[in-house]
Every structure is written in structure tokens, then in C-alpha cells.
């Protein structure tokens, strides 16, 4: 009975993907005038063609259609993924200083040139998935370039971990926040999670020893610095020395981290690391259950103390 329900869910999810989600982006969001994809459409399907274009949106489109092509082998998915790859490299990539611009005008010129490490991580995620799906050398090359700039400019060799954001030319920046609701701290759980995720995917197509070392380091950072070992929820915001001043629970990030940490240990093939993380990720997943409602929806966050 359980397997039947899972199989039925798989059928429903695949249908939703192919009949609704992917066609939406291919039919409504391709910008034929300026290239790439439109940056905004309202909930009532009103296109805002002059809206700015964000790096995260473009990188996620790249990952999505690359993964769809890898699994479903449809040429239209490859065409859309290639469009996203081309636009990311030609417009979002900073040819002078390296890295990815945060935001572009609708025409494709830089609007906000800060280097948000979260966005660079998603660019690696999308490019590495395209390389995984197609064997494309250019996508892999740019993914590796982005790995190098994160390691050169964001990695804190003294106190460990990764800085949240920097200026275009990699100097300290006053406002490091990913969004207005976030705390303005130098290190965050969210960015570390979305460095771990793309680094893991990059390792699938680039068996580099330094990359592997940093993946293992990131997993250990989650276990030793980010995880609250009393509650098994993740702490969210930190000073550069890993001091945590907030008690905010993000249930969605808890469940996301539980499988991304496990996936990382599996992909690098470190059996000792796998034995270390497996009992912990179960406890993280169980802690995420605190946010479940009777209708199986989940609370967004719980501000225990801020």
C-alpha cells in the first residue's frame, strides 16, 4: 500500500512538472527581445517586461531545465537550459572581477554588481548540472571559475566558513543581507547550505581534491557550528567567529539540510563521514516535524528569541 501511494505520487508530480511548471517558463517567461527570461510576472499573469533580472532566478532556471533534460531527454528542455546557460555567462558573469552580478536591468546590463555568495553558489549549481546533463566543457569551466572565486574571496581561512557578501571587486560590504528580512551578519546557515549543495553537484562532474576537502569541511561546519545539538534545529545567523545571537527556527531549512548533508557525504564517498552524519540527519528531520500542522502544512519560521 505504501509503495502504491509513492508510485502514484511520482506519477502526479511528473505530470505537474511536464504539464504545468515547465511549460509555464517556456511559454510565458522567455524574453525574445532582450534575451534570457523575464524577471517578474504577477499572480494574475500580468507580465512586467521592464522588471530587473535576478541571478538566482536565472541560475535556478538553468538547473531546472538541465535536470529535466538529463532525466526526461526532451530537446525543448535542453533548448531552454542552453538559453539560461548562455545568458548567465554572457550577462551575469563579471568578466573583469569574476563572480556573478546580483541583478541586471531588463536589457541585460548590470544593475546591482555586489557579489552575493548565495547567488554564485546557485550559478555553480546550474552550470554543473548543465555539464552533468550534456558534458558541456564551457559550463564546467565557468562552474570551476566560480568555485575558485568563492574560495579566494569568501572563504575565511582563519575562523572557517564563508562570508555572506562582498562588493563587485571583493571588498567588505556594509549590507550583506540576502533579503530585507534577514539579519545583517557575516555568516549565515542559508548561504553555507547553498554552497554545500552546488559544491556537491560540482564534485559529480569534477573530481577535484580541494573541492572534496571543502565539501567535507562544510558538512563538519554544519555538525559543529551551525547545528544546535540540544534541539537539532539549525541556527541561522552568525558573527564571523560563529557567535550566534539569535534563536530562530526555520523548519524548511531543517528538512532541506537533513538530505543535503546526507547527499554530500554520499557523493564524496567518505564512509567515515557518512557514519558520522547518518544518525544526526535523522534527528534534524525529526526536529523539523515540530513545524508540521495537522493538515501537513509547515510553519515557515519560529522566532523563539531575536
Positions of the model-derived regions?
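Glycan-recognition and catalytic cores of secretory/periplasmic carbohydrate-active enzymes
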Residues: 1-306
Amino acid at each position: 500500500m505504501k509503495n502504491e501511494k509513492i508510485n502514484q505520487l511520482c506519477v502526479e508530480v511528473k505530470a505537474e512538472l511536464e504539464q504545468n511548471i515547465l511549460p509555464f517558463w517556456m511559454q510565458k517567461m522567455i524574453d525574445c527581445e532582450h534575451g534570457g527570461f523575464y524577471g517578474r510576472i504577477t499572480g494574475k499573469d500580468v507580465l512586467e517586461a521592464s522588471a530587473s533580472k535576478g541571478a538566482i532566478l536565472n541560475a535556478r532556471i538553468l538547473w531546472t531545465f538541465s535536470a529535466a533534460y538529463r532525466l526526461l531527454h526532451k530537446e525543448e528542455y535542453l533548448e531552454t537550459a542552453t538559453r539560461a546557460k548562455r545568458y548567465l555567462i554572457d550577462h551575469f558573469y563579471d568578466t573583469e572581477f569574476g563572480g556573478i552580478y546580483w541583478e541586471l536591468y531588463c536589457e541585460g546590463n548590470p544593475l546591482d554588481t555586489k557579489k552575493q555568495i548565495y547567488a554564485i553558489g546557485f550559478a555553480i549549481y546550474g552550470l554543473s548540472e548543465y555539464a552533468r546533463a550534456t558534458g558541456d566543457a564551457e559550463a564546467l569551466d565557468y562552474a570551476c571559475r566560480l568555485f575558485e572565486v568563492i574560495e579566494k574571496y569568501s572563504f575565511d581561512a582563519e575562523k572557517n566558513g564563508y562570508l555572506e557578501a562582498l562588493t563587485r571587486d571583493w571588498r567588505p560590504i556594509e549590507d550583506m543581507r540576502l533579503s530585507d528580512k534577514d539579519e545583517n551578519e557575516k555568516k549565515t546557515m542559508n548561504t553555507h547550505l547553498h554552497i554545500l549543495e552546488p559544491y556537491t553537484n560540482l564534485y559529480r562532474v569534477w573530481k577535484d581534491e580541494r573541492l572534496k576537502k571543502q565539501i567535507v569541511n562544510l558538512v563538519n561546519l554544519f555538525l559543529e557550528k551551525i547545528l544546535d545539538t540540544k534541539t537539532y534545529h539549525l541556527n541561522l545567523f552568525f558573527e564571523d567567529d560563529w557567535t550566534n545571537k539569535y534563536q530562530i527556527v526555520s523548519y524548511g531549512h531543517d528538512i532541506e539540510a537533513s538530505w543535503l548533508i546526507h547527499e554530500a557525504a554520499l557523493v564524496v564517498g567518505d564512509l567515515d563521514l557518512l557514519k558520522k552524519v547518518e544518525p544526526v540527519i535523522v534527528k534534524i528531520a525529526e526536529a523539523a516535524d515540530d513545524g508540521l500542522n495537522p493538515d501537513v502544512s509547515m510553519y515557515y519560521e519560529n522566532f523563539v528569541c531575536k
